[in-house]
């Protein structure tokens, strides 16, 4: 290698470092605005439950906004995957305000949706615009993944999980290491920025640890299978229902109005009869699971059902926080059957249902460590690995590719 090539390489790293720092600051700040907005909206909705009656009308507004302003941005996360696989060249900047506004609307009126997919889209959209100004190999994909990582990290403040999520999610079985350096820097900076600006991190340090015995290893493997099946059930149900409702109700206005009206009635009935509250992110279910060690036996399946129906209707938001809630509540239900500590099993479910539904491995393992501490890391590895072994084509991301063997 010549001194000139070494100098050029050094210049590239200096440039990547500076841009990753800026991307982390920018995306972290926007994630804070988005995340705090969701928290305020969630609190407001819980104090004004009749808002859920207007879920159908809110849906009509969402469809109108996307019809009027969306264009290619209407593809959402699918567009991010298309750019990552070079099927599309760019992501319209309008995606950022549009996805933030429509997700806030979905939450305000009681939709059962998440936030992670939105944050990833925000980060990817903003970061990818820098690629055209940098002359390095694979700049488009590198900056796309850098933004995806920053978006995830700014919202959840789990920079390691965010980094590896971005590197492994585009193509199952391949780790895009060329983006590791800028993605890690942007993730750390985005996480620090959103936290410094007031967005709190979800952290539940576990006091209990599982002992390393053959019996516990078998039990955790069985849990990995159960949680893996739950994640795949979510993914397959979402894919099937999206296609079915689009075929049965091809008009998006009629589709979201009819399904939204039905959802509002059922969600309100369940809430008012004290069966459970399934609107919003599902953080209420997560809080009860980890702070009280309790959940209803049906919480996980109802949260799964309402999230799948809400997203299939056309409401905006992510899937990951509902997946966390599904995993945690299913874990609370399964733990007594296996004689294992409730909070540990809930934590394993939190991580591995997410991993199964997204067909990722390293990200859910690291989520377990960053949210719950690393004392139980070997058991996160076992459960997430078992869940990852299930059919990889069953994913919430239709644009995801599976690497050829």
Regions found by a protein language model. Give the residues of each.
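Alpha-helical transmembrane segments and immediately membrane-proximal extracytoplasmic
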Residues: 1-405
């Amino acid at each position: 290698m010549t001194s000139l090539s070494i100098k050029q390489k050094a210049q590239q790293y200096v440039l990547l470092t500076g841009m990753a720092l800026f991307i982390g600051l920018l995306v972290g700040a926007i994630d804070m605005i988005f995340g705090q907005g969701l928290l305020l909206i969630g609190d407001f909705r819980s104090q004004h439950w009749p808002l859920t009656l207007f879920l159908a009308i809110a849906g009509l507004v969402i469809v109108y906004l996307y019809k009027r302003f969306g264009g290619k941005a209407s593809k959402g996360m699918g567009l991010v995957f298309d750019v990552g696989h070079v099927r599309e060249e760019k992501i319209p900047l309008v995606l950022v305000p549009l996805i933030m506004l429509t997700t806030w609307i979905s939450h305000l009126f009681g939709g059962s949706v998440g936030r992670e997919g939105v944050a990833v889209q925000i980060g990817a959209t903003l970061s990818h615009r820098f690629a055209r100004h940098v002359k390095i190999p694979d700049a488009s994909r590198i900056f796309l993944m850098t933004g995806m990582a920053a978006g995830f990290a700014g919202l959840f403040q789990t920079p390691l999980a965010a980094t590896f999520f971005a590197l492994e999610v585009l193509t199952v079985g391949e780790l895009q290491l060329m983006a590791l350096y800028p993605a890690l820097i942007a993730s750390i900076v985005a996480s620090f920025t959103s936290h410094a600006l007031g967005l709190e991190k979800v952290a539940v340090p576990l006091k209990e640890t599982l002992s390393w015995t053959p019996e516990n290893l078998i039990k955790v493997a069985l849990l990995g299978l159960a949680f893996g099946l739950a994640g795949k059930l979510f993914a397959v149900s979402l894919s099937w229902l999206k296609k079915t409702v689009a075929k049965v109700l091809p008009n998006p206005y009629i589709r979201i109005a009819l399904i939204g009206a039905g959802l509002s009635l059922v969600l309100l009935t369940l809430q008012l009869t004290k069966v459970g509250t399934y609107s919003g992110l599902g953080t209420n279910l997560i809080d009860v699971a980890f702070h009280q060690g309790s959940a209803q036996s049906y919480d996980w399946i109802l949260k799964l059902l309402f999230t799948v129906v809400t997203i299939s209707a056309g409401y905006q938001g992510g899937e990951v926080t509902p997946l966390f809630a599904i995993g945690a509540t299913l874990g609370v239900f399964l733990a007594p059957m296996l004689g294992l500590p409730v909070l540990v099993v809930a934590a394993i479910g939190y991580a591995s249902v997410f991993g199964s539904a997204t067909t990722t491995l390293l990200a859910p393992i690291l989520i377990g460590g960053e949210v719950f501490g690393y004392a139980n890391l070997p058991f996160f590895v076992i459960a997430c690995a078992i869940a990852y072994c299930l059919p990889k084509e069953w994913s919430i991301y239709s644009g995801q590719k599976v690497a050829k063997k």
